[in-house]
Amino acid sequence: MKLKESQQQSNRLSNEDLVPLGQEKRTWKAMNFASIWMGCIHNIPTYATVGGLIAIGLSPWQVLAIIITASLILFGALALNGHAGTKYGLPFPVIIRASYGIYGANIPALLRAFTAIMWLGIQTFAGSTALNILLLNMWPGWGEIGGEWNILGIHLSGLLSFVFFWAIHLLVLHHGMESIKRFEVWAGPLVYLVFGGMVWWAVDIAGGLGPIYSQPGKFHTFSETFWPFAAGVTGIIGIWATLILNIPDFTRFAETQKEQIKGQFYGLPGTFALFAFASITVTSGSQVAFGEPIWDVVDILARFDNPYVIVLSVITLCIATISVNVAANIVSPAYDIANALPKYINFKRGSFITALLALFTVPWKLMESATSVYAFLGLIGGMLGPVAGVMMADYFIIRKRELSVDDLYSETGRYVYWKGYNYRAFAATMLGALISLIGMYVPVLKSLYDISWFVGVLISFLFYIVLMRVHPPASLAIETVEHAQVRQAE
């Protein structure tokens, strides 16, 4: 699908990274998408989130049910939101122009970019803690660097590990999207080695799977379990709230819809359930071994005394962290930043700007406890859920999966609305965010905050449809006629 020459030459709304991909560049098969998920899921913060569910009192079986439920919902959301990317070869920042306007799209795109950059900082810090353990084992004096000097609450050795691990990401970014595809193919499966070994250790030290999975939770009745269960599902989805939005950045490379849907199904529910089994087993095993559930896998590694195990485990965890960072937390904001200033910034420049901003996120504060992690995830869900709701309502209900590609790059086309902004999309987004996040400040409505992603998606989805029906833009009438003519021709 090609643009008109006028759109191709416009620097205000396009550059070579934002225009539709030609069919010759759409080469990703199901295995490529499955590999992305294998790499993304197996990482330290995901383990911490799953382990945190055990730590707050849910039983192993309850946690496993939470993971399976969340992964199936994620699969559905990703397959739906990725449809337009595959059909038109477009990235997220361009697709969202249809609902928010050609200029208004920059606001949710940059919001999503900010969230991804925060996640990039968190993931990079998590990987750097593993690297720090490796350096402490190789060089015992590493922890004494700087004496008692702390910078913003982190020891100098930890800060140096953070910066060094951050710099490794730049090597992968230097080679662009094709290197990301190749990296993901082997990075994900490699992580199974470490978590498989840790499961073996946990089962051995606990005396089998029976003692691990027979541990009771503190929630017994349905009424006691429902809200922790729902909050857990929301927390898991919150981890991937950014990727739900920017999945078109990847599905635009798919050969067909079938390939992206199959790949995400193979790579998400099954892989996530397997990872959940490993996380639950290791966390519960740590409770048997150390008298308390340890929700951070790096803390468990720090208690091992075999240097070979530590070296192999740390290297693999670092690879896994780079894998998820590049796929989930760098690609998306890179496109978003390029979309905001396409005349000056392409995908590669956006990638390096993203990496640079992640240095200033102070992520060690967010990783202090399971409580702080879940507070952050709830906030993410409340902010990004409404954007996903608007996107799906616009594409599937209002547009009926039909977009005018040329108009997405036009300053005089149907997606200009009012000076480039569609107030209906912003009103629906703000209402969804307000209702989903109000529980942070109003205790009686805390239950809404516990399921913030679902509330945000549902409210914005419905309200956007209402606004587009009650006060439709003039361009929508033209689209309705065009759709009717197409159906008659068929």
Swiss-Prot record:
Keywords: Cell membrane, Membrane, Symport, Transmembrane, Transmembrane helix, Transport
Gene3D superfamilies: Hydantoin permease
Any single GO CC term annotated in Swiss-Prot or TrEMBL for this entry: plasma membrane
Pfam families: Transp_cyt_pur
Catalytic activity, as annotated: (S)-allantoin(in) + H(+)(in) = (S)-allantoin(out) + H(+)(out)
Compartments it resides in: Cell membrane
UniProt cross-references to InterPro entries, sorted A to Z: NCS1 (IPR012681), Pur-cyt_permease (IPR001248), Uracil/uridine/allantoin_perm (IPR045225)
Main subcellular location: membrane
Family affiliation: Belongs to the purine-cytosine permease (2.A.39) family.
Protein name (database record): Allantoin permease
Organism: Bacillus subtilis (strain 168)
Organism taxonomic ancestry: Bacteria, Bacillati, Bacillota, Bacilli, Bacillales
Encoding gene (name): pucI
